[in-house]
């Protein structure tokens, strides 16, 4: 059996230029992933690898100005990037079989699930933990969101 890994995942996504132009069928879809970034940690939380790829958007090809300002990702950064199915397959291969995904906040996993469904892909994935929620509950002793800063 392969060694266990924690995959600390950070996604960036584009949104429609106008909320009224968001895709509504087969479900409301307003967050198209344009970057997957991750660190792999071993069982002792030592960094053992990193992964980063831009993703060429299919559904929202024009970059939302607010997204550009927040992420500093420009349209030209995405022009030669793989589309989501290839990028996600590469990411999952990099993750390996014996891992869990960790995020900081409640948004990344639902956005990832929506993108898998929009691309007609299998939405099965490793176990997932929202570290922000765990930190708030266990360390801060409340459910308020905490910034990493």
Task: Say what each PLM segment does.
Residues 27, 77-80, 141:
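Alpha-helix initiation/capping motif
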Residues 19-37:
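A short alpha/beta connector and helix-capping loop motif
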Residues 66-88:
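Metal-dependent phosphoesterase signature
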Residues 1-11, 15-19:
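N-terminal accessory regions of nucleic-acid-interacting proteins
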């Amino acid at each position: 059996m392969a060694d266990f890994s924690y995959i600390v995942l950070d996604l960036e996504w584009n949104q429609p230029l106008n909320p009224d132009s968001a895709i509504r069928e087969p479900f409301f879809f307003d967050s198209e992933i344009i970057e997957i970034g991750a660190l792999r940690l071993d069982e002792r939380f030592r960094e053992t690898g990193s992964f980063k790829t831009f993703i060429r958007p299919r559904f929202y090809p024009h970059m939302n100005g607010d997204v550009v300002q927040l992420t500093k990702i420009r349209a030209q950064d995405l022009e030669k990037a793989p589309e989501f199915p290839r990028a996600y397959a590469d990411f999952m291969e990099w993750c390996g079989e014996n891992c869990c995904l960790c995020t900081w906040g409640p948004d990344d996993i639902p956005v990832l699930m929506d993108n898998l469904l929009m691309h007609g892909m299998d939405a099965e994935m490793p176990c997932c933990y929202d570290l922000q929620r765990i930190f708030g509950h266990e360390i801060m002793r409340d459910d308020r969101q905490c910034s990493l800063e």
